[in-house]
From Swiss-Prot:
Protein name: 5'-methylthioadenosine/S-adenosylhomocysteine nucleosidase
NCBIfam families, sorted: MTA_SAH-Nsdase, PRK05584.1
One MF annotation (Gene Ontology) recorded for this entry: adenosylhomocysteine nucleosidase activity
The encoding gene: mtnN
UniProt function note: Catalyzes the irreversible cleavage of the glycosidic bond in both 5'-methylthioadenosine (MTA) and S-adenosylhomocysteine (SAH/AdoHcy) to adenine and the corresponding thioribose, 5'-methylthioribose and S-ribosylhomocysteine, respectively. Also cleaves 5'-deoxyadenosine, a toxic by-product of radical S-adenosylmethionine (SAM) enzymes, into 5-deoxyribose and adenine.
Organism: Shewanella sp. (strain MR-7)
Family listed: Belongs to the PNP/UDP phosphorylase family. MtnN subfamily.
Length: 236
């Protein structure tokens, strides 16, 4: 079993890379891919860069060059659930674009033309993540809708509009739906796991800078615990 792991920023992948053994590195199109062993599984970890285009490029290269059995997107997010605090975790129940609008042609808000409205993670990856939750100690984790767009959300007006469009949204970030869309195109199982670095409000820029390392660590810890739970025979 080989798992591809994608984070956008250095703090989101640093703990994973530090924990790897037998690591080797290759750079393709300016993106570094580090192959090795993590939590008893063969993995390839990459830092994609921020945003949907960067994430799409990295995901495509990862799948084409390394042929993983599944892809995990890890990192930080802005939170929309009152019961969660900074550092807590959202496991994707579904992933959607929040900044896509082709409703003039009969699509749902957030649905890209000729694509599903929501991208659904592989049940066996979500199941493994839920088993891993029990080992997180005081860190809370829930399943929920994660939305993606090419903007850092810190405007209450925009937050209000997003919640009107996606009332069940638990978190927002800048790469997950792009990664999910590429995985959908390739028939690749995926899951998105995000730790909250801020609450998508006026304080978000300050909170993000203060808590990105904490969020990156918690998300990385969740990924490692998930890997431990994965049964190689469960890939499907």
């Amino acid at each position: 079993m080989k798992i591809g792991i994608i984070g956008a920023m250095e703090p989101e992948v640093a703990h994973l890379i530090a924990a790897m053994t037998n690591a080797s590195s290759q750079t393709i199109a300016g993106i570094e891919f580090i192959a090795g062993t993590l939590a008893g599984k063969d993995v390839v970890v990459t830092r994609s860069g921020i945003g949907k285009v960067a994430a799409s490029i990295a995901t495509t290269l990862l799948i084409e060059k390394y042929a993983p059995d599944a892809v995990i997107n890890t990192g930080s997010a802005g939170g929309f659930v009152d019961s969660l605090s900074i550092g807590d975790i959202v496991i994707s129940s579904e992933v959607r674009h929040h900044d896509v609008d082709v409703t003039a042609f009969g699509y749902e808000i957030g649905q890209m033309a000729q694509q599903p409205a929501a991208f659904i993670p592989a049940p066996y990856l979500v199941e493994a993540a839920n088993k891993a939750i029990k080992q997180l100690g005081e860190v809370k984790a829930i399943e929920g809708l994660i939305c993606t767009g090419d903007s850092f959300i810190c405007d209450p007006v925009r937050t209000k509009t997003m919640l009107e469009h996606f009332p069940t949204m638990a978190a927002c970030e800048m790469e997950g739906a792009a990664i999910a869309q590429v995985c959908h195109q390739f028939g690749m199982p995926f899951v998105v796991i995000r730790s909250l670095s801020d609450n998508a409000n006026n304080d978000s820029p300050v909170d993000f800078d203060s808590y990105i390392v904490k969020a990156g660590y918690h998300s990385a810890l969740m990924v490692m615990l998930l890997l431990e739970q994965l049964d190689p025979n469960s890939v499907k």
